[in-house]
Design a protein with these regions (language model features):
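Conserved acetyl-CoA-binding loop-helix of GNAT-fold acetyltransferases
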Residues: 88-89, 95-109, 127-135
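Conserved GNAT acetyl-CoA-binding A-motif
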Residues: 110-122
Length: 173
């Protein structure tokens, strides 16, 4: 069963393999990261871990039984009890409820980071992401600037987190 794990240095190679294997798939929904991202991946990964240690973000990877990365789920711009959620899942597990289960779990974990509100933006043509957010309790909160989602028109979604959230049960995953 996949496990959501806090990002650490030891995940670097599996995350890079995940990003490379799914590059074309991700580019259908968001802007491509460009060759420079992959060429400088090690530096980027280290910088992300430094930001995480400083409390600016909280990054997680969904790890499969074979230790491969099935998805990335991140809380960015953490401040004043609010964070921006970003996520992506491997094409091979898309449409199987993996993203929904992980986003729900991350909503539970967000309280550990002192968060009360999560926001996420998705393009109008990314219906799957809209469904994930809706199933995880997010509601539309207004238009997203195309600069926030790779030049596409979209919507911001928001979820207010309740105190004492319980982790999702097996039937909710």
């Amino acid at each position: 069963m996949p496990e959501l794990q806090r990002l650490r240095a030891g995940h670097a190679q599996a995350v890079l393999a995940f990003e490379l294997a799914n590059r074309a798939y991700f580019a259908m929904f968001i802007s491509d990261r460009g060759d420079e991202f992959f060429d400088q991946f090690t530096e980027w990964h280290i910088a992300l871990l430094v930001e995480q240690e400083a409390g600016l973000c909280a990054c997680y990877v969904l790890v499969g039984d074979d230790d491969s990365v099935l998805g990335r789920f991140n809380l960015f711009d953490i401040r004043d009890g609010t964070a921006v959620l970003g996520y992506r899942v491997a094409e091979r597990v898309a449409g199987r409820g993996v993203a929904t289960a992980a986003v729900r779990e991350l909503c539970q974990l967000a309280a550990q980071h002192g968060l009360r509100t999560l926001k996420a933006a998705t393009s109008h043509d990314n219906v799957a992401s809209q469904r994930v957010l809706a199933k995880a309790g997010f509601r539309p909160a207004g238009p997203a600037d195309p600069a926030d989602i790779g030049g596409k028109q979209g919507t911001w979604y928001q979820r207010e987190l309740a105190a004492g959230l319980r982790p999702p049960g097996p039937s909710e995953r």
